[in-house]
Amino acid sequence: MSRLLLNCDIGESFGSWTMGLDAEVMPFIDCANIACGFHAGDPSIMRKTVSLALSHGVKIGAHPAYQDLVGFGRRSMAYTAQELQDILHYQIGALDGICRAQGGKVSYVKPHGAMYNDMMANPAQLRAVIQAVVAYDRSLPLMLMATRDNTAAQQLGDEYGVTLWFEAFADRAYDSAGRLVSRQLPGAVHHDCETIIGQALTIARGDNLTASDGSALHLQANTLCVHGDNASSVAAVQRIRQALNEQSAP
C-alpha cells in the first residue's frame, strides 16, 4: 500500500471566534492547509497556526479562497483569470511571509471551497490556477481533487511542469464521476467514525469505493483529507493515522 499523506484544513478561526481543534489534530497529520484570510483566518491566527505546524514538523500549505468571509469561501464568484491569479498571489504571499518570519516556508498550495470545485469543473480556471502557482514558485505542488480519471488534469500539470498532488476525502460521499456530492444533498458528509476510517483505508489500499449511485469508483490519490472539527473527528484522525502506519509497516 502506498503511503498517503494526511492533510487537514487548519487555521480557520477568525479573531475571537474559534473553529476546529487545530492543536488536537496537528500531531496526527502530515500537511496543514492553512487559511489565508479570504474565507477564514487572520494575520494572528495564521502566525499561531504556522507556529503550531512547525512545532510538529508538519508541511505547511497555502489554502487560498475566493474573497468570501461571509460564505466561508463556499460560494462561486466570477473572476477573470488575471483577478484569480492576483488573489492567489496575495494569499500565498501573505502566508509565505508569515512562514519565513518563523523560519518556515509554504510547501504546496491547495485552493479552498468553491475555488477548488470550480477549477475541477472548468479547465480554463484550472489553467489559471496552475499559471498562478508557476508564476509564484514552480516548485510548489498543487493539491487538487482526485476523480475517476486524472488524465486531463495531469496533462495540464505536465504542460507547465507543476507537480500535482491528487486528493481524496475520508468523510465525503462521491458521485459516479468521482466528484464530491454537494453538501446540499443528504449523505454528502460522513459523520460515523467507522465509516470515515473504512473509507480512508479503502482509498489507501487502492480498492474501489461505492459511489452515490452504487457504482464502483476507483480513486488514485497521493493525499487524504481529514477533518478535526470536533472530538469525534479528531479521534477518527488518530485512528486513521494509526491504521495507515500499521498498513505501511514492513
UniProtKB/Swiss-Prot annotation:
CDD domains: LamB_YcsF_like. InterPro entries: Glyco_hydro/deAcase_b/a-brl, LamB/YcsF/PxpA-like. SUPFAM superfamilies: Glycoside hydrolase/deacetylase (SSF88713). Its EC number is 3.5.2.9. Keywords: ATP-binding, Hydrolase, Nucleotide-binding. Forms a complex composed of PxpA, PxpB and PxpC. Belongs to the LamB/PxpA family. This is 5-oxoprolinase subunit A.
